[in-house]
Amino acid sequence: MAAAPVLEFERPIADLEKQIEELKRLAADRSLDVAEELAPLQKKLGDLRIQIYQNLSPLQRVQVARMSRRPFTSDYIKHAFSDFIELHGDRLFREDAAIMAGWARLEGETVMLIGHERGRDTKENLKRNFGMPHPEGYRKALRLMKLAEKFQVPVLTFIDTPGAWPGLGAEERGQSEAIARNLLEMSQLQVPIIATIIGEGGSGGALALGVADRVLMFENSVYSTISVEGCAAILWKDGKSQEMREKAATALRVTAADLVELRVIDEVIQEPVGGAHADHAATARALRETLTRNLEELRRLKPDKLVRRRREKFLRMGQFTE
């Protein structure tokens, strides 16, 4: 697999990492002790990561959210859960690999996991359709949510998609109906639902897994009704320039900090220094702890109260005073 491209603002980090690796390799080849030389470089690297990642612009966070080096649903399954059993098919047409789902255990408790899944190379991206589900993916998700409800098992969803697949076949097979059906059914599911935005949350394709009692979001994830490129192209007829994309990202308020302030999401999960891609295992631990805590709180609520509070939560969105 080819190395993932480095983002422009990350280049100073990549250059310093390369310098450190070369020094380590030289020390190993010649049996040299370079501890004194390494220490200041590693400190400089840590300081540089903090400096860069504490000052990301909204557009830079969009770029981070889309990185192929970020943990995907499959990575969180590997690091945060145990005993995963994948389930397939919508029982109506076909399997959709853009949605990964199945039974798992979280700290010993059975849960139903459902998440968008992307690819890291061409072969995987074609298999996963670049993380953009067909209607069959959303119908598979709903089938498994209803199965979880039958056995009174909590549902955990992971959101990471540019949007639902807009192809002709998907539209002919009822893409909009599949998304709308999920919104309706999730609003009245009788078990706890926690949605976590782990990367890019794009439009209705994200919302189809996002009607939940708690909506969590990683620090460098984004969530919006349209891509920044699409917004810039519609409003300013320029979806390619850095300036217009930055303007759109700021106007859309796509970041976790913006969305928790707007009460669209409930909690921000902090990422390791340098982003989630810098340490998959540490990011998964943070996710596991946050999910466990929220699930414990939701478990105390009776189903009717759970559903009522969930519906009220979403009905409150968009209210304002003049």
UniProtKB/Swiss-Prot annotation:
It comes from the Bacteria. GO terms for molecular function: acetyl-CoA carboxylase activity; ATP binding; carboxyl- or carbamoyltransferase activity. The keyword Nucleotide-binding applies. Pathway: Lipid metabolism; malonyl-CoA biosynthesis; malonyl-CoA from acetyl-CoA: step 1/1. GO terms for cellular component: acetyl-CoA carboxylase complex. The keyword Lipid metabolism applies. Residues 40-297 form the CoA carboxyltransferase C-terminal domain. Its main location: cytoplasm. Pfam families: ACCA. It is an enzyme of class 2 (transferase). PROSITE patterns: COA_CT_CTER (PS50989). It is found in: Cytoplasm. Keywords: ATP-binding, Cytoplasm, Fatty acid biosynthesis, Fatty acid metabolism, Lipid biosynthesis, Lipid metabolism, Nucleotide-binding, Transferase. One of its GO terms (biological process) is malonyl-CoA biosynthetic process. Its EC number is 2.1.3.15. It catalyses: N(6)-carboxybiotinyl-L-lysyl-[protein] + acetyl-CoA = N(6)-biotinyl-L-lysyl-[protein] + malonyl-CoA. Component of the acetyl coenzyme A carboxylase (ACC) complex. First, biotin carboxylase catalyzes the carboxylation of biotin on its carrier protein (BCCP) and then the CO(2) group is transferred by the carboxyltransferase to acetyl-CoA to form malonyl-CoA. Belongs to the AccA family. Acetyl-CoA carboxylase is a heterohexamer composed of biotin carboxyl carrier protein (AccB), biotin carboxylase (AccC) and two subunits each of ACCase subunit alpha (AccA) and ACCase subunit beta (AccD). This is Acetyl-coenzyme A carboxylase carboxyl transferase subunit alpha.
